[in-house]
Amino acid sequence: MERTFIAIKPDGVQRGLVGTIIGRFEQKGFKLVGLKQLKPSRELAEQHYAVHRERPFFNGLVEFITSGPIVAIVLEGEGVVAAARKLIGATNPLTAEPGTIRGDFGVNIGRNIIHGSDAIETAQQEIALWFSPAELSDWTPTIQPWLYE
């Protein structure tokens, strides 16, 4: 079953949106298999955003993501990577559709509440970076037969 990595950024944590955001994913039918709150080290943040290292916003992004606690999440479900991206919405909250997490709660591109893996391969890398195998739960929800054929 497909998995994705989600991070509720410091602005989402500070604004008390963690439960609401997790609820949206659960209501969609995705299974929570990893969950933890932490204040990322600079090294971890730089590894996570390494693809942006040469971009002008890199240092600001690393400073922001390490400025407070984040909630790291692993979700599981059919098509979860693409579906989670749709639920999250466009990177810029000002252009994100109403009903998406960023459209409903985001303020600006630098404070856009949440990160979600953009591809299956990226999700695998991000999950391995943020979680050890022992931190992930393998379980079967009783509603699974009602979700998947």
Swiss-Prot record:
Give the transmembrane region(s).
none
Signal peptide range: none
Top-rank EC class of the record's enzyme = transferase
What cofactor is this protein dependent on? Mg(2+)
The record's principal subcellular location, in a coarse class, is cytoplasm
Q: What is its EC number?
A: 2.7.4.6
Q: Which GO molecular-function terms appear in the entry?
A: ATP binding; metal ion binding; nucleoside diphosphate kinase activity
Recorded catalytic reaction(s): these are: dZDP + ATP = dZTP + ADP; a 2'-deoxyribonucleoside 5'-diphosphate + ATP = a 2'-deoxyribonucleoside 5'-triphosphate + ADP; a ribonucleoside 5'-diphosphate + ATP = a ribonucleoside 5'-triphosphate + ADP
Q: Where is the active site?
A: H115
Annotated ATP binding lies at K9, F57, R85, T91, R102, N112
Keyword Iron on entry: no
Q: Name the UniProt key words of this record, in alphabetical order.
A: ATP-binding, Cytoplasm, Kinase, Magnesium, Metal-binding, Nucleotide metabolism, Nucleotide-binding, Phosphoprotein, Transferase
**What does this chain do?**
Major role in the synthesis of nucleoside triphosphates other than ATP. The ATP gamma phosphate is transferred to the NDP beta phosphate via a ping-pong mechanism, using a phosphorylated active-site intermediate. (Microbial infection) Catalyzes the phosphorylation of dZDP to dZTP, when the bacterium is infected by a phage that produces the substrate for the synthesis of dZTP (2- amino-2'-deoxyadenosine 5'-triphosphate), which is then used by the phage as a DNA polymerase substrate.
The protein depicted here goes by the name Nucleoside diphosphate kinase
**Species the sequence originates in:** Synechococcus elongatus (strain ATCC 33912 / PCC 7942 / FACHB-805) (Anacystis nidulans R2)
